[in-house]
């Protein structure tokens, strides 16, 4: 394989799409309308070093004039005859564009096909070259517009209306010509339609909760044999890891079951998925078998990586290629399946040139056609003929100019084929006729399709008595046994042909169409209606007859509308969503049930909350909310919720209850419901139900303009000068109110909820509840879960740290050491400035989290595991020292946490206890490492943390470990190095010599 990376010049904006024209050209389209046509062979020669980069340049170039400066060219497709370009508001066509460029023209004329109205946006444009139908997907309203690209004016033949909540985002075209079109919608559904050339459609399959797509411009293609449907970012068949996505291949012949899964790297969403137009095969010489497979190239919407997969093995051919720092906007294969072209967002054209040995031998198209014939094809759409006759001339035609109308008559009336373009939504039968020399040359450039036409019996009913007067139109039924697999050829011969000549021509052709003429009496309810000039016309309600139901008058889809399912998370972790067979039955309340509490709650349903990875509960709106000051319990913030609007706003008061009667310090009105309130040292904060924060000082002045979070708030806590806010989608904010700044970038609590365990394939499940979420006086967020784990957020490391774990409760000797005598502060300890002795004796944050862990273990009945731990694990062989290892691990974690929290008194006690424990257990190397860590920066006499000097701390530890003989060698070395040995804490050498010792 060779890779050519070529930066494009002369294209303003970003390159958005690629188009290959046979095996000759590749068209590169820029967002600002700059279009370049490159010769594929020149790119391949450059990739294989057969020519230099200096000679590489585009073959042709022209500019697509945008009507609006804000519009961008995002869609492109076509062939040699016509090129279709589209923006998010309009679609245009360039007929004969390549011939004009080859003739030397640089300015081409385009024709408007479709333009949106009001606020509608085009989400995708697809072209079926076999059916000659252009699909335009729009929102507001959600529709699929179908345009006939064979006609000169590219007229719209029909449109498919979708549910207003099912916004079509992208479509997938069937390359086999079987007439299926797949749509991926915003409500995670996949809808498959069966469509014929006249625009008649029928919904054949709808898969709900299958795919997660966003408002992006996706590019998805099917394999050439069209036996499976690729679905990107599927909700089915994923590996279950958090943030992982998968591409699944749905077998169309087995009711769209998952036949294979392609799992890319974690936390990536596929944007481009293109199948090679060829099938490949490799022979296994050892087993004597031949393996056939498809190749598909995928790329994500976040990085510039490209992967090429073998669909048979479900594995990529090679590791992901990170070829660009920006995202890949589009990819396309050459017609021979040996070259892959890609463009990135930074305007670089990539050419992957493969050899035959790299990918495998290509399968001939005849064998691919045989595989297409084996696909299960849906029943054909309803079929009907429209026959019109006039004085002296009988015209037999099918709607939309489809098929060949033939009539047999004994008289000498002249018959011909005609086109009826005014009738819409009429079903037709597809018949074929050998291509004549008089046909348009525009079809000569297209390859002929192998057609399987069904045998039809056409009966023309005439009355011999009425022939002399005029010809009456009669409906003719046609029975079809099989859907045609190719495009029908139109009969455009304008020569006058008699009935005998037409009969002979049909019998000699290879179209297997038998035509018989029989005379029938006209039924009373199918009479023709004569116009004033004598012409005979058929009522529109009578000239459309289904082959199965003759009374069918409209062949549009009759699929009923359904209400979209709810995406709420079930309360039971293992329960699947079930339908309520009894309906909304009223359940009786048990006698001992508590009386319900009335809350003022509007129950907002927000899409960004419903589809978020984290969904936290929010407090219900209460009538009254009281919040006391952290400094003085007599200062009270009282909130009275009104009606949530301007007519009766919410009243916010700050009351001083130290005097009688109570005094109002300030009062404010908020035209919203208030859900939470908190207080700091010198500020008050409250939040509304829609996620707006209001912050006041003690006299009622707003310190900061109202902060808009956008979603309801689940936690609102304050301590000192810091304010903590956790939204219902898991976003965590921490502000320094004194400086009006964000303390650290916005983070999330998603890592705390065990996403790798709690993510399910089918539905989201509930994680552990968050029992506490607060902030320390130094601005460190802390959180506890219902399983007993406690965490703190390190703003320097920008990640969550584990503080307390239930595992340490089982094995550590110093777990929940509130009453441990070694940790009680000495009486000689003096409080620092601004800190009382009462605060020193209080339990630290680590001890608080350990208490919460104990409470959760007790609540869940897991305390009994402590006895089981001592009775079973400690007595097993190989686990004799597990208790001391768990104890040291617990002490080390507490040391590191208190160091980051800057709790100097707790840190002193813990490090002293830790050093003594190391000495008692004989961990000499670890004790030596502890001393080295403390004095590693002692030359500048700096503090380890504010208030703790490094040398003084080492002196304290040396004194505590002086009586431990097993570590005296370490303590003496460090005491001598720091100058404590001769005159301070150990012994006096001179006094010992005088006494003779």
UniProtKB/Swiss-Prot annotation:
Q: Predominant location of this chain?
A: nucleus
**Coiled coil feature spans:** none
Q: Does the keyword Ribonucleoprotein apply?
A: no
Family as reported in the entry's similarity comment: Belongs to the WD repeat HIR1 family.
Organism from which the protein derives: Candida glabrata (strain ATCC 2001 / BCRC 20586 / JCM 3761 / NBRC 0622 / NRRL Y-65 / CBS 138) (Yeast)
GO cellular component terms, alphabetically, are: chromatin; cytosol; HIR complex; nucleus
- List the PROSITE patterns: WD_REPEATS_1
Keywords (alphabetical) are:
Chromatin regulator, Nucleus, Repeat, Repressor, Transcription, Transcription regulation, WD repeat
Example GO biological process term?
A: transcription elongation-coupled chromatin remodeling
Write the protein's name: Protein HIR2
What gene is this protein translated from? HIR2
- Residue ranges of WD repeats: 10-48, 117-152, 153-194, 274-319, 323-362, 665-706, 708-745
Q: Outline the segment boundaries, as ranges, of region: Disordered.
A: 408-584
Q: Where would you find this protein in the cell? A: Nucleus
Where does the record place Basic and acidic residues bias? 464-480, 518-538
Q: GO molecular-function annotation terms? A: DNA binding; nucleosome binding; transcription corepressor activity
Q: Where is the composition biased (Polar residues)?
A: 409-446, 491-501, 539-567
Q: What does this protein do?
A: Required for replication-independent chromatin assembly and for the periodic repression of histone gene transcription during the cell cycle.
